[in-house]
Amino acid sequence: MTLSRVHQQVIAFPAVNTAPVGYLPDPASINKLQIPTSSKVSMLQKKKTDSFTNGARDQDKLGPKLTETVKRKLSLGAKILQMGGLEKIYKRLFKVCDKEKLFKAYQCYLSTTEGSIAGLLFISSKKIAFCSERSIKVTSPQGDLTRVHYKVSIPLCKINGVNQSQNTKKPSQRYLEVVTVDNYDFWFMGFVSYQKAFNCLEKALNEDEQ
């Protein structure tokens, strides 16, 4: 099946990476809204739902471990210092455009059809980009097993909107849904700093529109 041009630009499929397995520390853990045409974020609001999406089920599985998020955050900070800072990690993992500025990176999980994947969500002045903490096994076109990092890269100009959702039965379970102009959606959950991540993404989108 041929992917649309937008989909090709949005998704960076897993690619072999020379980084060591587990470039980040093991984590101690780990609805929809009409998109306004005038602004991507001016009308953002939360929508609660009783139905369980794949993302909700994923976070149910993660729930018991979320009590250790403080330890997880401290471990991440130590590892980032060891690697030389977020900028170096970001440039090592993704292609950086001219004048692109990295704002922040947040530990979270990306929901996939195969389950949730722990990693870092980078937010910059040009895109959001996710990379799994650990490499995963995939089969190459030649039929060989290889280990790769799972990556997703979405240019800000291809984001149609960002929605906040939460589980009505478990309000502490909160999600960010990123919807592209081609109507593909990406669910992020299990944030150590959920509101800070949303505010940072909102700021990036606002600045991109200016």
Curated annotation (Swiss-Prot):
SMART domains listed in its UniProt record: GRAM
InterPro entries in UniProt: GEM-like, GRAM, PH-like_dom_sf
Superkingdom of origin: Eukaryota
Annotated Pfam families: GRAM
Domain GRAM stretches: 88-166
Homology family: Belongs to the GEM family.
Identification of the protein by name: GEM-like protein 7
Organism annotation: Arabidopsis thaliana
